[in-house]
Amino acid sequence: MDWGNLLKQAVDVGFTLLAQADDAPARPAPEGHSGVRTAPTADRARRIAYAPELDGAADPGEIVWTWVPFEEDASQGKDRPLLVVGRQGGELLGLMLSSQHKREGDPDWVAIGSGEWDREGRESFIRLDRVLEVGEHDIRREGAVLDRARFDRVADELRGRFGWQ
């Protein structure tokens, strides 16, 4: 049996399901979900370092999936990818990704191109002005590792505009 091929097929199926979930309608928070908190990025300024390690625990530089509430109605939301930019104990700090092209040119969003986190290969954008605080146990899965150059571009924006180190 070719385990490598089988694993690749399983990952492909997972990415397909997640891409469909990204386009899914809003829904209430999942049962037992402790909640995602949001804060202005400057209020969570800290040292940022690239440290991905696909070991089952989310680390800075990894893109993970979790349920994210809508700003206009926090009781509704959907599964979204987040770039992990920090951690404190079991809490992760993440920046939300979007594949909506209306984000292009918006100063609160930075383009990072496409990657394994989006099965359809769409260009993605990371929101800079809103940090999401997520419990480690609320992460649905690890999605991908953002390469060092793109992570550094995001980190430079956080340092230059929001006081991160």
Where on the chain are the PLM-derived regions?
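C-terminal terminal-subdomain/extension
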Residues: M1-P25, S114-Q165
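Short alpha-helix capping/helix-loop boundary micro-motifs
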Residues: R47-E53, F70
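Compact nucleic-acid interaction/catalytic patches
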Residues: S75-D79, V84-E116
